[in-house]
Amino acid sequence: KTFSFNAFFNTKNFAINILSTNQADIAIRFASSATNKFQNIDFIENSSNTPLISNVLSSIECENYKCIECGDHYIFIGKVLKVQINSEVSIKDPLIYYGKSYRELK
């Protein structure tokens, strides 16, 4: 199992952070096998103690509801506890990963 799998499997809550098109570097970091993914990232404190990244389009706080084994992968299902939309970010376009590259919606 990977570092990321163990982090998700052993936690009560997790967060989904919706990045904007100028934040591909964060997506690349968290998609890597590095174990220091959270180093030098600014976070927002919150009641569920989940890693909400500062200056993202939106953050979704989830309870770790279920983990389903699917072949050699696992699917984590979260029960949404809270959604935050950041109206103060300057770039409003979400970062999309499609066709092995990062893109923006047009």
Question: Model-found features: residue ranges?
Answer:
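Basic, polyanion-binding surface patches
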Residues: 1-106
